[in-house]
Curated annotation (Swiss-Prot):
Protein name as catalogued: Transcription elongation factor A N-terminal and central domain-containing protein
InterPro entries per record: TF_IIS-typ, TFIIS/LEDGF_dom_sf, TFIIS_cen_dom, TFIIS_cen_dom_sf, TFIIS_N
Matching PANTHER family: TRANSCRIPTION ELONGATION FACTOR A N-TERMINAL AND CENTRAL DOMAIN-CONTAINING PROTEIN, TRANSCRIPTION FACTOR S-II ZINC FINGER DOMAIN-CONTAINING PROTEIN
The TFIIS N-terminal domain, residue ranges: 5-82
Record-annotated TFIIS central domain positions: 172-288
TM segment ranges: none
GO biological process, one term: DNA-templated transcription
Disordered: region residues: 88-114
GO cellular component terms listed in the entry, alphabetical order: nucleus
Species assigned in the record: Macaca fascicularis (Crab-eating macaque)
Gene3D superfamilies listed in its UniProt record: 2.20.25.10, Conserved domain common to transcription factors TFIIS, elongin A, CRSP70 (1.20.930.10), Transcription elongation factor S-II, central domain (1.10.472.30)
Length: 350
């Protein structure tokens, strides 16, 4: 197996172990990468830089982090050495700004020695810059969203591009921001307010992700709920409250489904709740003894049905609990003519 295939295989295995959070076996792969001769072409044609950078950011072991930092420092020296030799050939290497040419010139071998021996030789900005330089441009383009509704139209920052390369959640969060932006602008697409809606969409998504960062399933469910409520024409009060400042993006992100409902739906739910409580007060099975000794208090006819109910089987309101607590039975009456139903608490038998 060639060195390139070995490096690609090691990078793939490291990615799998990181996704399974199996950090115990990472040391063997990092040690193997230290023994393989790595060239600039290997770094650009494989995902080994991204894999080792994820170890540096996500692994809890300090020893493995130092080993990953040493590898990145060593590869940075290799890349700079190759780049300095071919500096007069601009076609081979894309220009990434003045960052590569800035700074005093120095011996690459010294960088390699310092990077391997010192665990603090590579800062987070240097690691990010290294990953940006080595990862090919076509891979970064594949991970970008198809439509860019956000941003000022200029080149993206190094940190943002690197986070998209290393974190698979970033494209999903970008898509959620786009969905929130489309839902916020569904009622009115005024161009002067476009930037304001973009800021609202970003802030709402950030607060939702903060709430459910440990449970992506709940995060997606919450985003779908927000988008559906914002697109509902009856919930136009949500956009109005955001625009007027009555409700902040954080408050909207923390709102439940019940709180986002419009007034009509809230009243309907309240009526359903009240009717269910009233029905729960009454017995489910209406059986009893036919009698003409009781006069209905509504239609004043003598055609009723009487049954005796145990107190313990019902959730009775306070007005029923006026009799002696020793009386365990309650008399329940229903009129066969008009359907009136009531409790008769003055006596328990006939």
């Amino acid at each position: 197996m060639s060195d390139k295939n070995q490096i690609a295989a090691r990078a793939s295995l490291i990615e799998q172990l990181l996704s399974k959070r199996n950090f115990e076996d990472l040391g063997n792969h990092l040690t193997e990468l230290e023994t393989i001769y790595v060239t600039k072409e290997h770094l650009q044609e494989t995902d080994v830089v991204r894999a080792v950078y994820r170890v540096l950011k996500n692994c809890p072991s300090v020893a493995l982090k130092n080993k990953a930092k040493c590898l990145l420092s060593k590869w940075k020296a290799v890349y700079k050495e190759t780049h300095s030799k071919a500096r007069n050939s601009p076609k081979l290497f894309p220009v990434r700004g003045n960052e590569e040419n800035s700074g005093p010139s120095h011996d690459p071998s010294q960088d390699e020695t310092l990077g391997i021996c010192s665990s603090n030789s590579l800062s987070s900005q240097d690691v990010a810059k290294l990953s940006e330089m080595i990862v090919p441009e076509n891979r970064a383009i594949q991970l970008k969203p198809k439509k860019e509704h956000f941003g000022d139209g200029g080149p993206e920052s190094t940190g943002k591009r690197l986070s998209e390369l290393l974190d698979p959640i970033t494209p999903m969060r970008t898509k959620c921001i786009e969905l929130l932006y489309a839902a916020l602008t569904s009622s009115s697409a005024d161009q002067p307010k476009a930037d304001l809606w973009q800021n609202f969409a970003r802030e709402i998504e950030e607060h939702v992700f903060t709430l459910y960062s440990k449970n992506i399933k709940k995060y997606k469910t919450c985003i779908r709920s927000k988008v559906a409520n914002l697109k509902n024409p009856k919930n136009s009060h949500l956009q109005q409250n955001l625009l007027s400042g009555t409700m902040s993006p954080r408050e909207f992100a923390e709102m439940t489904v019940m709180e986002m409902a419009n007034k009509e739906l809230k009243q309907l739910r309240a009526s359903y709740t009240e009717s269910c409580i009233q029905e729960h007060y009454l017995p489910q099975v209406i059986d009893g003894t036919q009698t003409n000794k009781i006069k209905c208090r509504r239609c004043e006819k003598y055609n009723c049905k009487v049954t005796v109910i145990d107190r313990g089987t019902l959730f009775l309101p306070s007005w029923v609990r006026n009799s002696n607590p020793d009386e365990q039975m309650m008399t329940y009456v229903i009129c066969n003519e008009c359907g009136e139903q009531w409790y008769h608490s003055k006596w328990v038998c006939f």
